[in-house]
Amino acid sequence: MSGNTFGRIFRLTTYGESHGPGLGGVVDGCPAGVPLDESVIQRELDLRRPGSASAGLAGTARKEPDTVRLLSGVFEGVTTGTPIGFHIANEDQRSRDYGDLAKLYRPGHADITYDAKYGLRDFRGGGRASGRETVSRVAGGAVALALLAMHDIEVRAYTVEIGGVPADVVDPAGAQGRLFFSPDPDVVPAWESLVHDVRAEGDTLGGIVQVEATGVPAGLGEPVFDKLDALLAHAMMSVGAVKAVEVGAGLEAARLRGSENNDPIIPGGFHTNHAGGILGGISNGQPIVVRATVKPIPSIAQEQITIDTNGRPAPLRVGGRHDICAIPRVVPVLKAMAALVLADSLLLQRRMG
């Protein structure tokens, strides 16, 4: 399997499966002198962790501590410039829950495509295709966030919609301490009620996550094929559940006239930010704004129609422990992916002068 490394200068390579001994990765290309220790990475992992407070009733019953162990690349609290290795053990996997799936393909999952490509698949939770894989992204993204902080660049992410119920973005700064990473305290009860009802129906929910980066200098991004917005879209779409990405006004731009969509240029910046902080694939100094649409988790507690590995029709009811709504755990993942892109682009710009 190829495609396990992300980035050009600041590179993250990940390994591990949902029901293997553990997951981890190596960050290569991080400069020396970045303040970093296990607590810095752990803080981000705790935001994504199964059973975290942000997920509430929406989360999986699988309770992984997600304790990170740094293996290399850090000495006396700073990076050394050498590869940064880390490992996170799987401690609460229950592979016996998946025995019935050995000969059945789960609708909405990558079972059938992995089988088509490799001639085999890990039916214990999906292996590399599991959302569990994203724990390594969050750990690698924490290193990127530490580097960006040295340059006064901040990345944050929050939920703007669950199950078709939108939030008003009134307090994005407080979203991290709120259920569902909501920027709107008033919408939380409606989301809780929706999750409760959908759980009772044996179904799942999707939603939309917004990622913002402030302090990004003008000039990041490499036309023509490595535009900053193209790289961010690549990063977001590489997350298994993401099905669409918008930048700035996004889909709404199709409904605007040019006179409405253009951001007037004024002394010191721009009057509006429909461009989402990127023009011509290059950052313009405005906040970067990206939204990702996340599909409902396909593991549902309802009977579904599928086929077995011999192509015969078969009913399926998925067991195991799964999220009702993965949005709260996707939020830190998308934040991490944006950080990886920005750290890589920043280092590339510095190298090119």
Swiss-Prot record:
Q: Which cofactor does it need?
A: FMNH2
Any one of the GO BP annotations: aromatic amino acid family biosynthetic process
One Pfam family of this chain = Chorismate_synt
Give the residues the record marks as binding NADP(+).
48
Molecular-function GO terms, alphabetical: chorismate synthase activity; FMN binding
Q: How is the cofactor bound?
A: Reduced FMN (FMNH(2)).
Provide this UniProt record's keywords sorted from A to Z. Amino-acid biosynthesis, Aromatic amino acid biosynthesis, FAD, Flavoprotein, FMN, Lyase, NADP
Q: Which residues form a coiled coil?
A: none
Fetch the InterPro entries from UniProt: Chorismate_synth, Chorismate_synth_AroC_sf, Chorismate_synthase_CS
* Reaction(s) catalysed (UniProt annotation): 5-O-(1-carboxyvinyl)-3-phosphoshikimate = chorismate + phosphate
Name the pathway: Metabolic intermediate biosynthesis; chorismate biosynthesis; chorismate from D-erythrose 4-phosphate and phosphoenolpyruvate: step 7/7
What does the entry list as the binding residues for FMN? 128-130, 280, 295-299, 321
Whom does it interact with, and what assembly results?
A: Homotetramer.
Q: Which family does it belong to?
A: Belongs to the chorismate synthase family.
Q: What does this protein do?
A: This reaction introduces a second double bond into the aromatic ring system.
For this entry, the protein name equals: Chorismate synthase
Originating gene? aroC
